[in-house]
């Protein structure tokens, strides 16, 4: 669909204060932010910017210490192909983030790890470490050793993992997803630059941890000219630092980038970039791994108003 207008209620104060702290954050010249609290311990922000290019960003801020909060990474598919000779032993079965939160009865979800496409199959292997509920789903690739992890006692962390730690009870690896690049380390932007992947502006999904232990789940839409045009890794990192990140990791992006919510009816709240059969953007992608948040409903919740587009009229 052609997106010609975005109508939002303005709530600029907090966002501009953050921009003053971290120069170069996209949206410094024109930004609008909406905030809601759909669940106990979960705050949801939608930020619409026009500089240096149009962006629509969704940020979920999760307090792992809040009552009722728990997490889940996509588990193994149980090797549905069996142990016959030549069996590819694929690790997970792809599904959209919306399908994942619906089937698992989670309240919020984002896409997770990079994965391989297998022709004529929804079964897939994932790139580097995936752990679900303490069970190793995908082995560690030392070239992608930075992971996002939820410990057994619900602490969020971003850490570098060694092969000897995987499968060890003392490692505290419980629900873990490997990413591609470390974006923020100890509050400093460390995102790489120089390659096409680093500096281009696709949709992005990222995760971060704040100094007080909160979890930041971020999506920025892209590949939709004039509506939302994506971010470089450096821009994502600066945005997350502006929101208090001390450590941050890049996850799978592009057409995989999705955030879904069940408030209470499951729905996708961002704008995926893959094309529908009619050629327009908005088709959710089935991915190898998703990350889900379980939480208690907030009785005082007021949903964010929908983003209006030309197709809404």
What role is predicted for each listed range?
Residues 4-16:
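Bacterial N-terminal signal peptides that target proteins for export
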Residues 146-152, 207:
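Broad, structure-driven detector of short, well-ordered beta-strand segments within folded domains
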Residues 172-194:
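Short, conserved active-site entrance elements at the starts or edges of catalytic domains
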């Amino acid at each position: 669909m052609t997106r010609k207008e975005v109508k939002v209620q303005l709530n600029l104060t907090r966002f501009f204060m953050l921009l003053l702290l971290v120069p170069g954050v996209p949206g410094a010249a024109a930004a609008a932010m909406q905030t809601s609290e759909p669940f106990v311990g979960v705050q949801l922000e939608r930020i619409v910017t026009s500089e240096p290019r149009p962006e629509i960003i969704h940020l979920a801020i999760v307090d792992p210490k809040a009552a009722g909060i728990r997490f889940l990474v996509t588990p193994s598919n149980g090797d549905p192909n069996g142990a016959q000779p030549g069996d590819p032993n694929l690790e997970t079965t792809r599904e959209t983030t919306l399908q994942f939160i619906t089937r698992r009865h989670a309240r919020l979800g984002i896409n997770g790890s990079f994965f391989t496409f297998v022709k004529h199959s929804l079964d897939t292997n994932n790139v580097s470490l995936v752990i679900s509920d303490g069970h190793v789903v995908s082995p560690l690739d030392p070239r992608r050793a930075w992971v996002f992890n939820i410990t057994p006692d619900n602490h969020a962390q971003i850490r570098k993992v060694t092969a000897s730690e995987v499968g060890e009870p003392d490692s505290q690896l419980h629900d873990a997803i490997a990413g591609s690049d470390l974006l923020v380390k100890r509050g400093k932007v460390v995102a790489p630059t120089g390659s096409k992947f680093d500096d281009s502006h696709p949709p992005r999904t990222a995760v971060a941890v704040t100094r007080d232990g909160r979890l930041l789940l971020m999506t920025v839409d892209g590949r939709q000219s004039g509506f939302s045009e994506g971010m470089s890794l450096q821009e994502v990192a600066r945005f997350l630092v502006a929101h208090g990140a001390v450590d941050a990791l890049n996850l799978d992006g592009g057409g995989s980038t999705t955030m879904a919510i069940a408030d209470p009816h499951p729905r996708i709240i961002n704008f995926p970039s893959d094309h529908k059969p009619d050629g327009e953007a908005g088709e959710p992608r089935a991915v190898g791994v998703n990350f889900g948040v379980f939480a208690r409903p907030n009785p005082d919740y007021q949903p964010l108003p929908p983003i209006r587009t030309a197709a809404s009229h």
